[in-house]
Amino acid sequence: MCRDKTYTIQSPDCSLTVTIGCGDRIVYSIRSDTSQILKPSPLAVRLVSGECWGRRSRVAGVRRYRIDEVHDAPVYKKRKVEDRCNGIVIDFREGFSLEFRAYDDAVAYRFVARQPGEVLVAGEEARFRFAPGAVAFVPYVRDTPCRHDGLAFGEQFMQSFENTYT
């Protein structure tokens, strides 16, 4: 089992620290250089087959990497976009990986299927246990048509930066 294994990565400027814990569940937390942002929060993916990635999963290996690239962006508001982060990929014996990236101003994660063939996902558990006093900006999708745009629920799915934040 991956009981009590803990992995940590920091953003390139060391202002954010992500801690990933493996035990009976996979949990992660985020800390800035001044305060706790996210308390340990569980992550899991349930497959149609009944398997659950993130529950009693066994670590097979860990790889760390660094990205420091600049990309041309001819149709964006900036000419060049920096891509700087530190990353970790945790491989699990159950045929999946969990990848985290820590940027100077953000954290991202994803589950990656390593097994051949099709993988059907039944659901995902992504909890966000914010520490007291933490501030978050959340884009909401309305479940009824909006007066000003008239979009139905299914037509509202888009990039999060295109939606209303509250």
Where are these regions (language model features)?
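N-terminal accessory beta-strand-rich subdomains and adjacent acidic, glycine-rich linkers
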Residues: D4-T166
